[in-house]
Structures are given as C-alpha cells and as structure tokens.
Amino acid sequence: MERLKKLVVAGLVLLIGLFALTSCSKAIRTQSSSRTSETTQISRGPLEVTKITYLVYCGGLNKVEMYVFTPDLKVEKYSIYPEGDKTYDYLAGELPSDDLYDITEFEISDLEWSSMVNVLTRVNFMELEEDMSTKDIVDDGASYFIMVETSNAVNISGGYVAGYDDDPDSRRFAEAREMIENAINNR
C-alpha cells in the first residue's frame, strides 16, 4: 500500500511538471514570436520619401493651394487662381500661366519632415486607395490630395472632403493630412 501511494505521488508530480513545462514552452514561443513581429515592423523602417505634394482645392473659391515638400526641408507653396473651367494636372506639375499663380518658399524643421515621414509610414500611406472622397453630401467642401514619392514608388490619395469619413482608411488619410497641415501652420 505504501508503495502504491509513492507511485501515485510520483505520477502526480510528473504530471504537474509536464504541465508546467508545456505552459512555459508556450509562453516562450509567444514571447519570441511577438519579438519577431516587432523586429519585422521596426526593420521595415520609415519610407524613403523623396517628395510630398499636398494639394487643396479650396471649396467655394476659385483657388488652389499646392505645397511641395522635399527632404532638404524646403517647401514651395503655389497659390493658384485658375481661369474659368480650365483644368490642370497640378500633381503632374502642370500649371497655368505665370500671372495666375504666386509662389512662396519657406523651410520646415528636420523634426517636422521626419514627423511627416513617420506618420506616412505608420498609416501605411502607400497602400491607401486613390479615391478617398467622402460618402456624405457636403456643399462647398474642399478637396484634399496627397502625393508621396519614394525612391521606388508613387502614391496619390485624396478626393472631395477626403479624410472626414469615419472608416479606417479615412482616419489614416486624415492623420497624414493633419501632420502635413501642422508643418504648414507651424512656420
């Protein structure tokens, strides 16, 4: 009888030990895989942005504002007053005659540039769809477009009242737009 008790106790100790080892092993694997995914995200690093163009068609006004940001921290602001119904592909660099726009230049800080690049990276801007126009009916709203050029890709996203809907993509666009507007307004 004494021997049977010792066998039962030894079996229980063995069973508890195996259970503890299995739990530890799962915890180590989970911790290791979360470190791996963190490393993957970190190693992706910020986008290698070569130019950011922010375009605003001012709602209800015959005015377009375009800002061109470059890594040398220079910004060119184009205040464009287009004539009549004529349209231009501003993002492709097409502009009306010189007398229909003004250019001003200013600089942003290195922190503002890196903040814009970090936000564009974090919101995965290069994966946003091109048309981000609002689904709601809004009178005289502005249209917002962002074009990001990297060392190996270009993505344009935006539209009528873009970034004001409540879906995840609109929130991602809004976050990028707000960071760019902060850099513009902080000068």
Segment roles from a protein language model:
Residues 26-61, 126-187:
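Short, well-ordered, aromatic-rich surface patches in folded extracellular/luminal domains
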Residues 81, 85-103, 159:
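Acidic/histidine-rich, surface-exposed loop or edge segments in extracytoplasmic proteins
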